């Protein structure tokens, strides 16, 4: 029902004898709508009704997701609900509906503080369009409840974001650990074979990556070592983002009373990341879900992202 000030003014002017066309043109009001409104009877009522939806079931499913993954925002909650709906053969839930329900029930995460832009311009692109073109690697450490420190080295594919291999140790970041991760990544993607064309191995300038033994071993496996610019963490942004994700969504909430327990739970975290963690660059699919979808459809990575 029209209740705007312009419409009310137009009706008043027409009631005083002004022409409908002149009033609609001067006030920029739809003449057709004025024509309909003026011919309504006094007892006219708007028969339209807002759609009432029962959100109880969706709210229960949302609580189930955030009960297990409390650091997930509404987009990743929606992605997991969508995946479950696809498995059950049910209609997918709209992301805006998930946002509305979570907002009404105070389940949204707090907004992150604004990050000041970097003064150093970064014009390159770390992500690639096809799998097995570029892999990236980095490391991080975290502390257990008993004070024991674990150091993790990992490798990711810069297209499908799958964690190819990882290693955890109580020692430092060394060349032997990096070589183990390299070998595990190659075996993960190529089995007992070597890449038919060199795969870029993108890392920072840590001594374990720049060591001659590491670089020689990389070339033996069909990898081409590439190092980022000095003091440019954004040049290895995919690996840096993964560190933030694994610490925020997994390490911060998993039990880690000692190193052995933490290592076991970390293995489950990497498996959950590969199999279930929705990634925005993959259309909010998990890395392995994205790979399965691509293999099933027989499509390239670019076309797969459009589906």
Swiss-Prot record:
Keyword Cell division: no
Gene3D superfamilies (alphabetical): Ribonuclease H-like superfamily/Ribonuclease H (3.30.420.10)
Entry GO MF terms: DNA binding
Single Gene Ontology BP annotation: DNA recombination
Xref: InterPro entries: HTH-like_dom, Integrase_cat-core, RNaseH-like_sf, RNaseH_sf, Transpos_IS3
Key words, A-Z: DNA recombination, DNA-binding, Transposable element, Transposition
Integrase catalytic domain: residues covered: 112-295
The keyword Amino-acid biosynthesis appears for this protein: no
One Pfam family hit: HTH_21
Function noted in UniProt: Involved in the transposition of the insertion sequence IS2.
Name of the molecule in the record: Transposase InsD for insertion element IS2-9
